[in-house]
From Swiss-Prot:
Keywords: Cell wall biogenesis/degradation, Disulfide bond, Glycoprotein, Metal-binding, Secreted, Signal, Vacuole, Zinc. This is Inactive metallocarboxypeptidase ecm14. It is found in: Vacuole; Secreted. One of its GO terms (biological process) is proteolysis. PROSITE patterns: CARBOXYPEPT_ZN_1, PEPTIDASE_M14.
Length: 586
């Protein structure tokens, strides 16, 4: 009873601390947005005392109102545009999927989208998804060859309705069928499940991050990796059991980033989900405990806080940051095209109205520059080594490896990149049955595996130079750098329903666990890593585990280190200095 009372007092104190955000804080919460209705809609007379106390604690932490009436809110009540404004912005918009057969078709489609300033949602080796108003379809088809005028299918024909319903509703998501306080493990899981039942606005995410660092201070710290153009901090959670590294050996760090593109809400939710699973399982799971002892894990839920807030307040499909450009009516820079390495790639983007506008010079996108400076500071002044970089995006279910700027330049560690990526994709397939394709990140590459030949397609949707993926791989020599495009394959696109938050989070948690297992090596062979996979199958009839093992040829910790040393020699084979003048060097 005494321990239970102590836990309650700690939670109450945490609520008070979290609510007391300094007035001068650089984190600027957005106007009040309809929060997730968690608990208060339950009749008070049906609650047990402990449930009411728990509800009050969570409501105090997250600022959840005490009562709501069913139905959609008005603009004044919820800070969200009513349906009339949604219809005014997106009323006739649809999403079309084009199937490409050859390079000429790809070039024609790319040129047409440039001329009409269309929003390319996805461009893969199999399809290209384009958002446009219905009245623009004849103009687009008029610019295309005859073979493409019938090579498309409607993917989303009710875009405005899907956009409106993508925001959290006023439907309560309480604990109707859940008992009162049970074991601490189960209670922790229930607490996490509440947060991930819907997408959350930035203000709630920041409060949640503060809560995590307060409740789990032994292995969680809230840090900032920079400040956005509008003055918001870019918060991150650093997980690990070590303090400042004073040893000669660099502290190995895994970095996971989401929300570079504001409309990709699932990437932000997934970063927080993976972080929460590692936080909650530390000390309970041998595998997770080992990962937090061996590495620092840094999670940045949204690199683009200004754009993310804007998607909640004004434009659900906003992609770029909110930085002014040379055209007053076309603000925003694509933060995944603003990095210095091979900036703007093979095609120059000079139109600020483009969704892929990379700025007028490298690192003009402020948030990208801030993250780059933080990473350089960590490696140069804090004795850290970023050994893995996971850049989460949506959609199309792909695991992409460098380089993105060109399909003709091969990364010096191509074999390792492909092998690990295939193992991660296999882990996803064997646990959640979802298929993630593995390929190079350079846009528009199509591989004919049956003919053992490949052909380059003209990139549809803009240049792929200046990416974070290439910068971390080249500049910091982060060998295991991946851009992962999450669910789905186009049925919902960027408007993925909240029911997919937890399943997608489980997939990336499994990816993080398997990647961590690979990085640790055979020194942790006594740990049953498979036991911690989420939604994992059991064992085969003969008792063998059915999931993938990423330990290649028994490579242990020393094997990984020796591989890193060997890679340093491979980097020297490429003369980057003469050809890539934008690079800042150690």
């Amino acid at each position: 009873m005494r321990s239970l009372l102590s836990i309650i007092l700690i939670l109450v104190a945490s609520a008070a601390l979290i609510a007391a955000v300094p007035a001068g804080s650089s984190i600027t919460p957005p106007p009040p947005i309809e929060p997730v209705q968690l608990l208060s809609s339950q009749p008070s007379d049906s609650k047990r005392p402990w449930i009411r106390l728990r509800d009050w604690i969570i409501e105090s932490i997250w600022g959840i109102p005490k009562s709501r009436s069913p139905g959609f809110p008005s603009k004044d009540a919820a800070g969200r545009a009513p349906p009339s404004q949604v219809l005014a912005r997106y009323g006739s918009d649809v999403v079309l999927r084009f199937q490409l057969r050859d390079q000429q078709e790809a070039e024609a489609l790319a040129q047409a989208t440039d001329i009409l300033f269309l929003d390319v949602w996805a461009s893969t080796s199999e399809f290209v998804d384009i958002r446009l108003a219905q009245e623009v379809i004849p103009s687009l088809l008029g610019l295309l060859p005859d073979s493409l005028r019938t090579a498309y299918t409607p993917l989303i024909d009710n875009l405005s309705e899907m956009i409106y319903t993508s925001y959290p509703t006023r439907r309560p998501v309480g604990l109707e069928n859940q008992p009162g306080f049970s074991s601490s493990i189960r209670q922790s899981q229930q607490f996490g499940d509440l947060f991930f039942r819907d997408y959350q606005p930035l203000s709630v995410i920041v409060h949640w991050m503060r809560l995590m660092s307060s409740m789990f201070s032994s292995h969680v710290r809230l840090i900032n990796v920079g400040v956005s153009y509008e003055g918001r901090e870019i918060p991150a959670l650093r997980l690990g059991t070590s303090g400042p590294n004073t040893q000669d050996t660099p502290r190995k760090t895994v970095l996971m980033v989401g929300g570079s593109h504001a409309r990709e809400w699932i990437s932000t939710s997934t970063v927080t989900y993976v972080a929460y699973q590692l936080i909650a399982k530390y000390g309970k799971s041998r595998a997770v405990t080992r990962l937090l002892e061996e590495f620092d894990w840094v999670f940045v839920p949204t690199l683009n806080p200004d754009g993310y807030v804007y998607t909640w307040e004004s434009d659900r499909l906003w992609r770029k940051n909110r930085q002014p450009t040379s055209l007053r009516f076309c603000p925003g820079i694509d933060l995944d095209r603003a990095w210095s390495f091979e900036w703007d790639g093979e095609r120059t983007r000079t139109n600020p109205c483009s969704e892929n506008y990379a700025g007028d010079e490298p690192f003009e996108g402020l948030e990208s520059a801030q993250l780059a400076q933080w990473a350089l500071n960590e490696t140069q002044h804090h004795n850290a080594e970023i050994v893995a970089f996971l850049d989460l995006h949506s959609y199309s279910q792909q695991i992409l490896y460098p380089f993105s700027f060109s399909c003709s330049t091969m990364p010096p560690t191509l074999e390792s990149l492909e092998e690990v990526a295939m193992g991660l994709a296999k882990t996803i397939r064997q646990t959640t049955q979802e298929v993630y394709d593995v390929t190079s990140a350079c846009e528009g590459i199509v591989t004919a595996q049956e003919q053992k030949a490949s052909k380059r397609f003209f990139p549809v949707g803009g240049s792929s130079g200046g990416s974070a993926l290439d910068w971390f791989y080249h500049q910091l020599h982060t060998i295991y750098s991946y851009q992962i495009k999450l669910r789905d394959r186009g049925s919902y696109g960027f408007l993925l329903p909240s029911e997919h938050i937890v399943p997608t989070g489980k997939e990336m948690y499994n990816v993080a666990l398997r990647l961590g297992q690979f990085l640790v090596g055979e020194s942790a062979q006594d740990i049953d890593w498979s036991a911690d996979l989420m939604d994992a199958p059991g064992t085969s009839d003969d008792g063998r585990e059915t999931d993938v093992d990423l330990n290649r040829d028994g490579a242990g910790e020393e094997g990984v280190d020796s591989e890193l040393d060997a890679v340093d020699e491979e980097w020297e084979l490429i003369d980057w200095e003469d050809e890539h003048t934008y690079e800042l060097r150690k």
